[in-house]
């Protein structure tokens, strides 16, 4: 059952996903994004930043040098990224996880811009 308008919208969405090959594109861009997060984590320090995710649903978990969840750093990074034009929220019980869920149409340029801004914000936060 369902409303005809809702069904029509769902079918149009499915056609768009298929015609633009968005599932495969999502997997490709997600891997690129995750690889960039891993490189960034290596520069910042793996004990401080732990990237993970699948497709375009990615996260970066932040810790202090003593291993404690770094909710304060996550909040500072979120505020800095907001001022740079990126919207994200800290997640998890201690709020030390930066979650990234870009649209399926995100491109390499946008990912690169976000990684640069994130790198600056993390560097400032951990200094």
Language-model segments: residues:
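Conserved N-terminal phosphate-binding loop of PLP-dependent enzymes in the Aspartate aminotransferase
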Residues: 1-127
């Amino acid at each position: 059952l369902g409303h005809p308008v809702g069904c029509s919208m769902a079918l149009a969405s499915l056609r768009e996903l298929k015609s633009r090959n968005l599932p495969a594109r999502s997997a490709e861009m997600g891997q690129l994004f995750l690889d960039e997060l891993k490189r960034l984590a290596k520069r910042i320090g793996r004990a401080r930043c732990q990237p993970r995710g699948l497709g375009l649903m990615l996260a970066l978990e932040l810790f202090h040098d003593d291993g404690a969840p770094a909710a304060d750093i996550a909040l500072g990074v979120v505020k800095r990224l907001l001022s740079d034009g990126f919207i994200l929220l800290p997640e998890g019980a201690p709020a030390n996880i930066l979650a990234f869920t870009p649209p399926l149409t995100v491109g390499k340029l946008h990912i690169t811009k976000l990684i640069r801004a994130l790198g600056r914000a993390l560097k400032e936060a951990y200094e």
